[in-house]
Amino acid sequence: ILDGENCWEYYPHNGYHFLKQLYSRLVEHPKIQLTTFRDYLKYHNDSTRLPSLVAGSWVYGTFSTWIGDPAKNRAWDLLCKAKDDFDRVMASGRLAPEIAQRAEEQLAICEGSDWFWWFGDYNPAESVADFDQLYRAHLRNLYRFLDEPAPPELEHVISRGGGAQENDGVMRRGQG
């Protein structure tokens, strides 16, 4: 499994040529067989159930980077409402196929986890303001595709930030 975001900006063309060559060589290698989780499990039924699974991530081993802060929770509430509205409109069948496809793509943009990374008081205000405006703009775009009025809450700032400039970036300093 390759992490899809955190190192590629340091490669020319975001790692496109590197990854293309890497995957080509892996495919051609006589002793390596590429697969997906789904395909592997299809042919290997002997798996055992885990008795438990700990929630966590590579950031502090918790989900606190994405949820729990009041601003992050507000952003999730807005996304959940948008998803409910999306589901209702899609179930109605009233959108033309090409508009439905664009709405689905727009929803996928809104569902990206990076939005929630930026919300909260530990990131610098300038960065938070940019991501806040962009996130709300993407949600409004979704409502445009759905031909639904956007909730008035989308006109209000979700998060203001306020952290030190040194926190501006993909990694946060460890605690303790």
Regions picked out by a protein language model, each given a short descriptive name:
Residues 1-176:
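Active-site and substrate-binding clefts of carbohydrate-active enzymes
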